[in-house]
Amino acid sequence: FWMIEPEVAFNDLKQNIDLAEEFLKFCVNYCLKNNSDDLTFLDNRLQDEESLLKKERRSEMGLIERLRFVVENNFHRLTYRDAIEVLKTSKPNQKKKFKYLIKGFGADLQSEHERYLVEKKFKTPVVITDYPKNIKAFYMRVNDDNETVRAMDVLFPVVGEIVGGSQREERLE
């Protein structure tokens, strides 16, 4: 398991999210520019493997096309509360297809939930913010609602969580 966790002194949560998104786009763009032979090989390999799958199970875009999409588009941002509402009302949750059903606020998101948000609902990288304070670390800045903290996770298609971070608590009291 590999992940990036940006924590920058004097940055607020939005600045940390912007930094994470810019960093990921820089890395992907670097690979597109400097590793085209490798990416073409992987793209062809993926297409060969997916040709064995039923049409509805195949990716809508090839690997290189997906990477370009990441670089050229903004990541979708939503709060944990909004993500829970999307998941709670989703077909997989309503039809009990999720292994871990979403009942409401406080649910710890699992890989199946993250993949649904990224791959089915929004079809783009997703940033979830403002998690419940009881499922995150003590050092994260508590929001004014006293229920959530200034935390974020960046979710990528196929990969899942690739960046996690927060605004650190800086207030003495």
Q: Model-derived features: where do they sit?
A:
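Residues forming anionic-ligand binding surfaces in small-molecule and nucleic-acid pockets
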Residues: 1-10, 151-157
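Metal-assisted phosphate- and nucleotidyl-transfer catalytic regions
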Residues: 22-155
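Extended C-terminal subregions enriched in glycine
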Residues: 158-173
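Catalytic palm subdomain of template-directed nucleic-acid polymerases
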Residues: 7-19
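An acidic- and aromatic-residue-enriched active-site/binding cleft used to recognize and process polar
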Residues: 11, 131, 167
